[in-house]
Amino acid sequence: MSSTENNGTAVPLQEFEYKAEMKQLLDLIIHSLYTHPEIYLRELISNASDALSKARFNALTDQDMLDKDAELAIRLTLNAEEKSVVIEDSGIGMTEEELIANLGTVAKSGTLGFMQSLKEQQQQLDGNLIGQFGVGFYSVFMVTEEVTVETRSFHSNAQGYRWRSSGQGTYTIEQIDKATRGTRISFKLKEEHQEFAEEYRVEQIIKKYSNFVDFPIYLGERQLNSMTALWQRPKSELKDEEVNEFYKFVASDFNDPLDYLSISVEGMVSFKALLFLPKEAPPELMYRQSELENRGPQLYVKKVLIQNECRDLLPEYLRFIAGVVDTEDLSLNVSREMVQSSPVMAKIRQILTGKILGWFEMLAKEQPEKFKTFYKAFGPIIKIGLNTDFTNREKLIELLRFESTKTEEGEFVTLREYVERMGSEQKEIYYHSGNNRAQLLAHPNIEYFREHGIEVLLLSDPVDMFVIPSIHEFDKKPLKSIEKADCDFSQQSSNKAEPVAPNLLNPVLQAFKEALSNEVEDVVESRRLVSSPVTLVSGKDAIDSQLERMMKMMNTPMPPAKRILEVNSSHPIVRNIAGMIMADANNPLIKTVARQLYEGALFLEGSLEDATSYVTRMNELIEAATLTR
């Protein structure tokens, strides 16, 4: 055992052995659990910040505290040529016993077993089983072969100590003369990690992970962190300019946010948050589900960034929300890279979801134009929640907005507004689905409703067909697609044209059935058509044609359902066909016209697959028509 000189007295250099499980633990940390070497700096800064917080607290009551008036700060010294790094704080420091307890032993029994399990399963751990083990310090061995820690406790008569280890099985402790309170960590970087001695790289890491810690972080005389954690301040103290700049920083957006929400919660769980609504949705958010799965606000613990995009903070349909959530209540796993599935996390998520939905409701009532901008950008994503978040389903339904036959293009109506202006005789909420507003308004199925002034919701968002049918009813009024054959058509039509007599119409219907026996379920007289000769509708229990088309586009086709062809008995074409049958029931033109009308109905709704045959047949009919003149 060697010795050192301290105040003229020989003090032995003490060597200690790590326990077997500590050695295995170090190996796991260095080689398995930390996926990014830069994390080491975040961990050391976080530990320094904790030590400074304790020093600040003790200064309130301990009048004899060592260096009571010293600035509470973290100082970095880099030497790129020597590949060395020094991290020093003026925090609470450590005694010899604390050095052994904090740096020489496992923080909690059973740690190694949990760590090995984490490595094998690569999954989050239950917050009830694993706490904060405090082993983040050892991440420094990812970037160095040996680390030296010099420390002196805050007690006025405290002795200084030097702790040194290569992480290989032993560590040493010796007494030293250290004039100031706090801890100094120094080491030389491995060859492959010398980038961490470059000022630009260290500044980059500090701004990414530790920009908002409570204490200044100096590199030389230059402060690297802003320390301005806006989410910690009351909303009344926030200025739009600084909020906008902060949003651009956390969201990597060049635009100002559409709106923001400041949250402060105290109770069973405590946290603060500053959340933002972007003005626009990135295109990839609409077309790639994985984009939503991997998004979320930033998660901080004690102002230290733990997870840049924390998907566990919000349900999937709200993950377009940017911002920061900061709590001191959350249990973390050892590497701080994954948040544990804990009751605390679940509670934070529940509270955040409720407050965000309340925020949307407030915008809808108090700032409708701002809400409309938000809904146009993120409405399709919000609708996803109807099929996933059953707890908040009613709130989400109230947020839904639709264009309708009574709104201008780009304007919306809510389900509640729709119900309030329904006629007393109307029992159902009607909707029509398709590719765009113009197509929907031109569709034959809507003619009856427009003639009688019955409002129809126009669903042109692809998401609608997956979520709207699941609502079933609103305010005790069933939602009904106007494509269904069993809609209520009890109001008298103002169409003055005389319908074809039943004895003449029945042969027409029969001729259509024979011509289209393989394509349609039935051919019936229509009560909905006003100006079109035919239309296609679905049976009571059949799926909508729009949903069927979308399933095909997604390569998940459903068994094709036969449709019902409705025929307008007052239309001139139908009257002419009746005359053709009376003249010659075997006229081949009858079947040709029947098929052309059927495929024309398919064309109008976007379901026609063989456009070539349709156009060829149309040309033949035009040729026949022109020959008779």
Swiss-Prot record:
Stored Pfam families: HATPase_c_3, HSP90
Origin superkingdom: Bacteria
Primary localization class, coarse: cytoplasm
Localization per Swiss-Prot or TrEMBL: Cytoplasm
Gene3D superfamilies per record: 3.30.230.80, 3.40.50.11260, Heat shock protein 90, C-terminal domain, Histidine kinase-like ATPase, C-terminal domain
B as annotated region, ranges: 337-549
InterPro entries: HATPase_C_sf, HSP90_C, Hsp90_fam, Hsp90_N, Ribosomal_Su5_D2-typ_SF
Region (A): 1-336
Protein keywords: ATP-binding, Chaperone, Cytoplasm, Nucleotide-binding, Stress response
SUPFAM superfamilies: ATPase domain of HSP90 chaperone/DNA topoisomerase II/histidine kinase, HSP90 C-terminal domain, Ribosomal protein S5 domain 2-like
GO molecular function: ATP binding; ATP hydrolysis activity; ATP-dependent protein folding chaperone; unfolded protein binding
Keyword Cytoplasm carried by entry: yes
Region listing for C, in residue ranges: 550-629
The keyword Chaperone is annotated on this UniProt entry: yes
Gene Ontology CC annotations of this record: cytoplasm
Family: Belongs to the heat shock protein 90 family.
Task performed by this protein: Molecular chaperone. Has ATPase activity.
Known partners and oligomeric status: Homodimer.
Protein name: Chaperone protein HtpG
